[in-house]
Structure formats: C-alpha cells, structure tokens
Design a protein with these regions (language model features):
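Active-site loop segments of alpha/beta catalytic cores
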Residues: 1-31, 98-334
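Short, basic/low-complexity N-terminal boundary segments at the transition from targeting/disordered tails
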Residues: 26-48
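Short active-site-adjacent helix-start/loop capping segments
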Residues: 34-37, 78, 135
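Short acidic, Pro/Gly- and aromatic-enriched capping/linker segments at domain boundaries
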Residues: 44-61
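A gly/proline- and charged-residue-enriched helix-loop-helix capping module
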Residues: 74-116
Length: 334
C-alpha cells in the first residue's frame, strides 16, 4: 500500500463535504459494524461484528416482530411468506405496529465485544434496516405499500406512520453515535426495479422526502453523514435524494453514474461501480478506472465521485487495483 498524506477517513469526509479530496475515494476506505444485538441484523442475515455469527442462526423477528426467513440461494432474507401481513390498511398502524424498546437491547455488551473491531483510520458506518418504503412493505406487502404511497384517502395516516418511523430511526442512530461513535448512517431503502422506479419523483418528494430529511438533518446536526443505499434504475429520483439531504448514494450499475455525476455531482457524491467479477479481465477493469478518472479530472474541484470496487474474482489482486487508483489520482486534485 502506498503512503498516504492523510487518513482514508479524512479523505472520505473531504469528499462528502464537497471539499477537495487528496485522491479518488473508494468504498474500501470505509468500514461498517452491524452488531448482533440489533434484531434486524440477525433477521436480515447481515451481522458484521468481531465474532462471526452462525448462518444457521439468521432469520427470525426484526425489531417490529416481523418474521424473516433466510434464503440460501440468494444469500439474504425475505419476510416469511406463510405469515399474514401485519397491516391490511395503513390506518391500522396505531393499533398494530409495536415500536421496539431499544433500551432493552444490550448496547454496553455490544460495544464491549466490538471495542477494537472498527478501523478508526477509515470512515465508519452502520446500516439501518429498513428504510421507509421497505419497512412499509414488511408491514403490508409490496402491493399495499405501493398503493399507500398514492392513495389520497390514507395520506394523513401514512405521514403519521412515516413520522413515527423517522423518530425510531433517529433514536437508533442516536444510540449508535453514543456507543460506537460512528461517522455515518447507511440507510437501506430500495426504490426501483432493474428497469424503472417503483414510484414517481413527485411521490418521493411528497411522501418520503420530508421524513428522510428529518433523519439526515439529525445526522448533520450531530456530526454525522447520511448515505442512501437504494437499488434499482432510479435516475429520475435523484432530485428527491438531494432534497432529502443525502450525502452519497451507492446505486446499481444499470444507472448512468457518469451522467448523474455530470448533472448532480456538485450536490451529491455518486458511487461508480467498478466490478471485477469472474468474467472481467484485469485490462477491462483498469481501463474503466482510467476512463472514469479522466472524465472527472476537468471538474474534480466542483463535483464528487467515488469508486465502489466490487472484486469477486478469486484471481484478482484487489489491493493492487486500489493502489493503482490512489497512485493515479494522488495529486490530481491539487
């Protein structure tokens, strides 16, 4: 690894503040913790902490008591299809949705066993499962959740529920800041399919943005950042993300990341996927890195982009790729 003039954490924060980084940031400059005392991390098979969590113990109820089942073929969980949905109509939420008592979770124990887990030279974060739309889906199924976003008759009930969910997320984040002193909340909410968004930008602005903005405002007021994990072909929803106060978005590769960088990179940091899978050659991966770097070079002081390097080729040298990107861009921002 080449010598760096500042820590990877400091460089990442420069990017998020739209200050000039010293080299092009990469996702490997970050690290995250998802401890097992949070029910959703077990339910969603996403425990990341000092001690590995046994795969046979994943699944089960999330923080709202919704049961999840682990599906080995997709390496992830889904709501238990044999259990009826909690809500048939969003107006039922006050009687049926039971919010978690987070003070009953063992925060002190989780902090103690993970005391040395986080690499403080990197940017630290935790994931929050699930975001507004995904949580609504877990309560009432996809079709009813989608209808709730556009049904004028339930608008007041929907906003009341989403406001309560925002309160819940803020309390979650407050405790993670207190016990783990993390830099960022990684908010998990998918808004689209491979071809298009699930809803319009108008719906996103009216129904989701006000509540996301409360969460991002809390993060910013408490020295944190707000990252949105949002899958799908959702280029049209970028204005809503910006209005929600999102600092960076790690979207999927079917989106034109370079085009979005050109259009919105002065207001949100866009993550460009750098995939090195079994079918990619080293030459292809390095050539893409070169193309992206040369594209951002002329506007590097005004707009922000980072690489999401996904190395899934057993013969690939991931660290050599990262050193190549650092050496090629170190000094580029001077």
């Amino acid at each position: 690894m080449i010598d760096l003039p500042i820590t990877r954490r400091e460089n990442w924060i420069r990017m998020l503040k739209h200050e000039t980084p010293m080299w092009m940031p990469m996702y490997s400059d970050t690290c995250f913790i998802m401890p097992s005392h949070v029910p959703d991390n077990i339910a969603r098979a996403m425990v990341v902490e000092a001690e590995p969590w046994p795969i046979e113990k994943v699944g089960g109820p999330d923080m709202f008591g919704i049961p999840w089942v682990y599906v080995p073929t997709v390496h992830g969980s889904m709501e238990d299809p044999d259990v009826p949905h909690l809500l048939e109509d969003v107006s039922e939420w006050r009687e049926k949705v039971k919010f978690p008592d987070m003070d009953a979770w063992d925060w002190a124990g989780a902090a103690e066993r993970n005391r040395d887990f986080l690499d403080r030279s990197r940017f630290t974060t935790t994931w929050f499962f699930s975001g507004m739309f995904e949580r609504l889906i877990s309560f009432m199924g996809f079709e009813n959740a989608a209808m709730a976003l556009i049904d004028d008759d339930c608008e007041d009930d929907l906003h009341a529920l989403l406001d309560a969910l925002a309160d819940n997320c803020i309390e979650f984040t407050r405790r993670f800041k207190q016990w783990f002193d993390i830099d960022c909340l990684y908010f998990h909410d998918d808004w689209g399919s491979q071809r298009s968004p699930f809803f319009s930008v108008r719906v996103a602005r009216e129904k989701l943005v006000p509540h996301l903005r409360r969460i991002s405002d809390w993060c910013h007021a408490n020295g944190m950042f707000f990252e949105l994990h949002c899958c799908g072909m959702i280029e049209d929803l970028m204005p809503a993300m910006i209005e929600a106060g999102v600092d960076n978005w790690c979207g999927q590769s079917m989106n034109d990341k370079v085009g979005l960088f050109d259009k919105y990179g002065d207001r949100i940091a866009v993550g460009e996927t750098l995939m090195w899978g079994p079918d990619n050659t080293k030459e292809e991966v390095y050539a893409k890195a070169d193309r992206v770097i040369e594209h951002i070079r002329p506007v590097r002081h005004e707009k922000t982009m980072y690489f999401m390097e996904m190395v899934m080729n057993k013969d690939a040298d991931a660290e050599a790729l990262r050193d190549y990107i650092r050496s090629k861009t170190l000094g580029m921002y001077d």
